[in-house]
């Protein structure tokens, strides 16, 4: 059974999460960057294998703050993108696309993480609108799974020097969608002009449309798959600052989010930031059905980024 409900993202709160994430300075030794290009860096189709060689990351002095803005773009579909599923989609009105671009402009962010992007043409459309507003974010990553119309995207002012994104992430026990995460994992590393690196991961877990509990179960399974991926990522790069963001479709106390955070008091633990708006509110979505407010969009950082400065700047 499907639940019919009206919902809207908090435009005054964290329809976008904004965080000053460059509270520490970072550099990398023996790093081989990709060619500095504004073109999209292709994502892998499958999850990485085990046994990756440990990379050692050096930590230089602090640098200037870097601002990250994340947002669920709300079905950013444009006619130029091919349809990847049998579901009917509605193209996003020009006014709504302009509103997304304006939110990004107002944030002043150098890096933007997006979910529910309709494809390559949708990303180009947003970049074009940003450029008209004087915002240059030429570097990008797009993750689109076959059979899914909504994808993950990252736009950056700075070069993307590594892309380990996974389109088809295996999910244990999932009987649908060939046992993969619905929207994959965006995993890209951005390098600032002073040499610091930030590994950014974007996700969008299964929606909350089903009343029978299947959606919740799917999110939990996706969460375990993501947690396994995070464990490998943290173990394989010693000293890399890592930030996870996205639309989790679950609150802080829900099991999926708890699984993703990982075990307490270990290097694998992710710390959840709590950005607040000018009124001190933290909710990110409102459901008219039930008149309820929820925090489903989250931002997590690893121990390297979790300092008092990070908490103050969020």
Tell me what each language-model feature is.
Residues 78-79, 121-125, 150-151, 209-212, ...:
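Extracytoplasmic/secreted cell-surface and envelope-processing proteins
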């Amino acid at each position: 059974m499907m639940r019919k409900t009206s919902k809207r993202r908090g435009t005054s709160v964290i329809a976008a999460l904004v965080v000053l994430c460059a509270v520490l300075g970072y550099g990398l030794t023996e790093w081989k960057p990709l060619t500095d290009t504004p073109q999209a860096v292709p994502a892998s189709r499958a999850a990485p294998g085990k046994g990756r060689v440990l990379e050692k990351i050096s930590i230089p002095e602090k640098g200037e703050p870097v601002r990250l803005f994340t947002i669920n773009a709300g079905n950013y579909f444009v006619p130029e993108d091919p349809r990847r599923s049998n579901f009917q989609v509605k193209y996003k009105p020009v006014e709504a696309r302009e509103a997304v671009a304006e939110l990004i402009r107002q944030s002043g962010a150098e890096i933007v993480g997006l979910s529910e992007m309709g494809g390559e043409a949708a990303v180009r459309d947003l970049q074009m609108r940003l450029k008209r507003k004087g915002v240059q974010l030429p570097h990008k990553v797009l993750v689109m799974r076959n059979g899914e119309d909504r994808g993950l995207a990252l736009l950056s002012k700075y070069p993307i020097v590594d892309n380990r994104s996974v389109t088809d992430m295996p999910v244990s026990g999932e009987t649908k969608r060939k046992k993969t995460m619905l929207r994959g994992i965006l995993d890209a590393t951005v390098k600032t002009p002073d040499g610091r690196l930030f590994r950014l991961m974007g996700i969008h877990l299964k929606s909350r449309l089903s009343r029978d509990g299947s959606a919740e179960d799917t999110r939990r399974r996706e969460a375990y798959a993501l947690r396994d991926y995070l464990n490998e990522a943290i173990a394989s790069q010693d000293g890399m600052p890592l930030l996870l963001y996205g639309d989790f479709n679950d609150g802080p106390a829900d099991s999926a989010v708890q699984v993703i955070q990982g075990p307490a008091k270990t290097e694998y633990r992710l710390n959840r930031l709590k950005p607040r708006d000018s009124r001190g509110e933290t909710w990110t979505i409102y459901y008219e059905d039930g008149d309820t407010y929820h925090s489903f969009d989250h931002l997590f950082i690893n121990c390297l980024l979790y300092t008092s400065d990070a908490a103050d700047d969020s």
